[in-house]
Amino acid sequence: MASPSGKGSWTPEAPGFGPRALAPDLVDSVDDAEGLYVAVERCPLCNTTRRRLTCAKCVQSGDFVYFDGRDRERFIDKKERLSQLKNKQEEFQKEVLKAMEGKRLTDQLRWKIMSCKMRIEQLKQTICKGNEEMKKNSEGLLKNKEKNQKLYSRAQRHQEKKEKIQRHNRKLGDLVEKKTSDLREHYDRLACLRRLHILELTSVIFPMDEVKTSGRDPADVSSETDSAMTSSMVSKLAEARRTTYLSGRWVCDDHNGDTSISITGPWISLPNNGDYSAYYNWVEEKKTTQGPDMEHNNPAYTISAALGYATQLVNIVSHILDINLPKKLCNSEFCGENLSKQRLTRAVRKLNANILYLCSSQHVNLDQLQPLHTLRNLMHLVSPHSEHLGRSGPFEVRADLEESMEFVDPGVAGESDVSGDERVSDEETDLGTDWENLPSPRFCDIPSQPVEVSQSQSTQASPPIASSSAGGMISSAAASVTSWFKAYTGHR
């Protein structure tokens, strides 16, 4: 191999052993090439155009060194040494990695231990909180158990109370049913007793009967006296006389002027049609004629006596039935003399209203009632054939029947009284809704025979002595009412 200088022989030194002699063939090749200088040929090793060259064989085998003598170590030796160093580096790296792997594992274990400690601490705190909550829940559970036990005991007591109340309610229901049955029977007995008293009252003291009259129709009389009136006018007057306004309509009344209703005897009666013109005429004649009235059969006396008896009967019946009348009417309202037309009409209207009120309370068939027929309505009320006579309980008055009362002699409403003492307003005698219904006193039986009515007293009155008989009957009726009242207060 040629040396880097190109002249003379050069023996490289092996690393660690000093200079080393060149091989004989390498020396020969170098000697042979000493005189060759190629200007354009480049060195395959350093890629320069220096004149000193190295052969390809030496380059391929790595058998060359620096030509300037800086390092005597061949390339192949360096390569081997580099390989050895790399191997040592790899061994050192493996040892370092092995040593670091233990450290890494130690750090990982330390980190895991620290994480586990933190987690254990958190778990301890969680367990502590859980224990506290469990303790609280246990205390709450105990309280709830005690509360539930109390509620259960209370529910048991309430159940016992409920069963006791149910038994009590059943007993009360049976008692109420029994009391209701007893009350119904009591009402039935009371109705029978009231019915008995009313029938005794109407059969003994205030008997009523229908009396046929033989008088002619005033329309016929007027037709005979007034020749100017035609037959058609007479027939119209007769037809108008036989009609009555009832329940919002005009109805025909066949018994308008043919009959009259008597009370306490056939000599005391009222016209069936409610015509009190005889009383009005007598009052007018009384004003013009001075002196005592010698006519005992005067219709005015019989009308006033019949209305007075009817008033007494209505008041007694309302007392027996325990019903407050809507209109306050005294028994002596018709006993005075010279009653004006307006005052008499107002009193009759109140009497009719009271009678209709009593009829409604006893469920009398309203189709049989007419506002002008005072005694006939009263007969329907106290009739023995009335099924509900003596009943107790609520009732309702028909509005059309009340409205029909307003048409009773409407012309009288516009008239004014001459005397100031006769101006009696309806408010003074009205028993409307302003009156408070006080509870009735303790029920007591009215004696069935409170007054002994002798046959002589019932036969003393005679038709020729009408005025004295009327006064005697009024006094006897008043005495009977007084005796009933004394017997009633005596039982209290």
From Swiss-Prot:
Q: Which GO terms describe its biological process?
A: autophagosome assembly; autophagosome maturation; autophagosome membrane docking; autophagy; cellular response to glucose starvation; cellular response to starvation; defense response to virus; early endosome to late endosome transport
Compartments (UniProt record)? Cytoplasm; Endoplasmic reticulum membrane; Preautophagosomal structure membrane
Task: Detail the disulphide connectivity of this chain as listed in its UniProt entry.
Answer: none
Give the bilayer topology.
Peripheral membrane protein
Note whether Transmembrane occurs among the keywords.
no
What's a Pfam family in this record?
ATG14
Keywords attached to this entry: Autophagy, Coiled coil, Cytoplasm, Endoplasmic reticulum, Membrane, Phosphoprotein, Ubl conjugation
* Residue ranges that the Swiss-Prot or TrEMBL entry lists as coiled coil: 70-180
Protein name per the record = Beclin 1-associated autophagy-related key regulator
What's the source species' lineage?
Answer: Eukaryota, Metazoa, Chordata, Craniata, Vertebrata
